[in-house]
């Protein structure tokens, strides 16, 4: 029997929609035998919380409400050492605390996280120093800190300062492919991601357009190469950086994600 895995894409604030869709998958018992996880950016946060026993609807409690993000549009020269104006660590204290409380280890390494949970966890990030994609995991990078890897995976250029790990600078894994299926090709995989990209208006949207096209094409190619993938796609009414939403708005978007599960309306008819 093949191993079961879950792949969750990135998406910034749109991850709330993914949580809703993932909740329906979880509620149907489809994730019961999953022991391998792969996540990018917001998807890495979702996977980490799920691994320690926090289901998708419970994860809404840990979704950050951020009203003070600053942007630097010149930061799309992404190979400069300091791009972005915010340290991502500032916004993840609640997330880090719950992980530490659940496994009883402060600032765990990837090896310690695996030993505490028994789950293999791949976290994608782009190494801009060496110009390559990295899939952090407990076998290849046992001594890397879990939170460093997750922060690196979500360090969106223009928003967050790149994360330094062992002398290299890392940015959001989505700048290569926001749907990290590559480590899972030999497993029976459930994948949760967004469908076609939505292009935003304005200068910031135009600057993201090429990146979004690349990410979409890379995702489609990764899907083609995976021999045993059960794919769930959705759309979101949120934008990538809509991180200042109220609790009611988050819940509405969560339910929007739930309704996109193929069986949702059949069950609730």
Residue positions per predicted region:
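Patatin-like phospholipase
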Residues: 1-40, 48-269
């Amino acid at each position: 029997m093949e191993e079961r895995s879950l792949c969750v894409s990135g998406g910034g604030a749109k991850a709330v929609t993914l949580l809703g869709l993932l909740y329906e998958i979880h509620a149907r018992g489809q994730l019961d035998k999953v022991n391998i996880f792969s996540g990018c950016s917001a998807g890495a946060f979702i996977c980490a919380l799920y691994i320690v026993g926090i289901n998708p609807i419970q994860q809404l409690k840990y979704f950050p409400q951020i009203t003070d993000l600053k942007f630097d549009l010149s930061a799309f020269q992404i190979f400069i050492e300091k791009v972005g104006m915010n340290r991502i660590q500032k916004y993840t204290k609640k997330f880090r605390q719950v992980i530490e409380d659940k496994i009883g280890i402060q600032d765990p390494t990837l090896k310690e996280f695996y030993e505490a949970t028994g789950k293999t966890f791949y976290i994608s990030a782009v190494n801009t120093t060496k110009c390559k994609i990295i899939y952090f995991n407990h076998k290849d990078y046992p001594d890397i800190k879990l939170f460093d890897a997750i922060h690196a995976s979500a360090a969106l250029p223009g928003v967050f300062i790149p994360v330094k790990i062992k002398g290299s600078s890392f940015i959001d894994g989505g700048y290569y492919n926001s749907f990290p299926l590559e480590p899972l090709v030999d497993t029976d995989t459930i994948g949760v991601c967004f469908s076609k990209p939505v292009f935003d208006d304005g200068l910031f949207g135009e600057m993201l357009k090429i990146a979004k096209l690349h990410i979409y094409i890379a995702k489609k190619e990764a899907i083609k190469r995976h021999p045993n993938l059960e794919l769930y796609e959705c759309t979101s009414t949120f934008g990538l950086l809509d991180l200042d939403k109220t609790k009611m708005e988050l819940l509405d978007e969560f339910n929007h994600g739930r309704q996109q599960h193929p069986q949702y309306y059949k069950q609730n008819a």
